[in-house]
Regions:
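Short hydrophobic alpha-helix segments
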Residues: 118, 124-125, 257
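C-terminal beta-strand edge segments of enzyme domains
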Residues: 217-344
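Active-site glycine-rich loop that binds ribose-phosphate moieties when present
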Residues: 131-147, 164-168
Length: 344
């Protein structure tokens, strides 16, 4: 049976002064997409409450107030903001991919959240390496988030912005046979060169992985740019750089991309195109050479606290009997190693 789903890449501006308002705007966009028959909607990078554009155009010594405001408006996951989006996704029967500034106690993270069509969060991942100015704002993610998940729309993977220039991060998702890659960029940055580079990146990933790419970028109005910085020279750094698009496994646009203003790119994804591409070049299957080249990925969630403990000494009645192979190995739960008497 032929599989076809309708996807939307949504180019949208945050409400800089109202994080809750941005959440409501996202929910309205989900309803609007649902009216168009959309089954998968992808929103831009850290849309909620907004991408930290201030860190790109202001020196660190002057951005303390803006940094504090971002902390105040960043969202816990789960929390009221994600619950509102989950409800909208559930009502629309839609898979939603959303970028948020996640607050985890005293740290902020660039997080991507995938909501399944029933509203459940099936993936929350954090950008593994914040880029350039972003390192003053966000902490780092871990390898556990480089995961493809099953959803009502298919097998989904996600990366944010320049993570796409980390070929091993992309390959980690490719080896899990992602069918739809959900890409997010901030948009409204750097100018046309950023949009051009972005298009090359997403089209290349579609070709290399043999999957669809749904890419969403943000947008800033002139008034918002002026609010971020009154300096004309710096305002140029916050214009252009948008390429909201949907790409086929053959590397072609399935609908005209959106470069300016708010809007929605909608296209039908015919999954037979994945087979059409992969029958000739499956980079993690018949076209791979794992005995020559392969990937090692650490899937353990990052932790800053590891508990070491020692098991209680066994009684003689419960000691394991000796074997021809010698004494039994130490209990694997024991995390304290004591040197033998006389050892150095």
């Amino acid at each position: 049976m032929k599989r076809i789903i309708r996807a939307a890449a949504i180019q949208i501006a945050p409400i800089l002064e109202d994080g809750d308002g941005t959440v409501m705007k996202v929910c309205r966009s989900i309803r609007e997409a649902g009216a168009k028959g959309v089954q998968l909607a992808v929103f831009p990078e850290t849309l909620i409450p907004y991408y930290p554009y201030f860190s790109f155009v202001r020196p660190p010594v002057l951005m303390g107030g803006e940094h504090m405001r971002l902390y105040d408006n960043a969202v816990p996951v789960p929390g009221p903001a994600t619950e509102a989006v989950a409800s909208a996704a559930r009502e629309a029967g839609m898979v939603v991919v959303l970028g948020v500034n996640e607050r985890d106690h005293g740290s902020l993270y660039n997080a991507q959240i995938i909501f399944d069509a029933d509203g459940r969060i099936v993936l929350k991942r954090r950008k593994i390496t914040p880029t350039f100015h972003e390192r003053m704002v966000w902490g780092q993610g871990d390898g556990a988030g480089l995961t493809v998940v099953e959803t009502a729309a298919g097998r989904l993977g996600a990366l944010a912005c320049w993570e796409h220039y980390n070929p091993l991060a992309r390959y980690a998702l490719m080896t899990q046979h992602e069918e739809i890659h959900c890409a997010q960029f901030p948009g409204s940055m750097v100018g046309q060169i950023f949009a051009d580079q972005m298009e090359v990146t997403i089209r290349h990933h579609a070709l290399e992985s043999g999957c669809f790419v749904v890419n969403a970028t943000g947008w800033l109005s002139d008034a918002q740019i002026t609010a971020i910085t009154p300096e004309t020279a710096l305002q140029k750094a916050l214009r252009g750089g948008c390429c909201t698009a949907i790409i086929s496994p053959e590397g072609v646009h399935l609908a005209p991309p959106l470069h300016e203003g708010e809007g929605m790119v909608v296209a039908d994804l015919d999954f037979s195109l994945i087979t059409k591409r992969k029958r000739m070049m499956d980079s993690v299957g018949h076209y791979a050479r794992p005995e020559l080249l392969s990937l090692l990925r650490d899937t353990r969630p990052a932790r800053t606290h590891h508990t070491l403990f020692e098991t209680t000494k066994r009684t003689e009645a419960h000691d394991d009997p000796p074997t021809e192979a010698g004494p039994q190995p130490a209990d694997h739960r024991s995390a304290i190693v004591r040197p033998e008497v006389g050892s150095t």
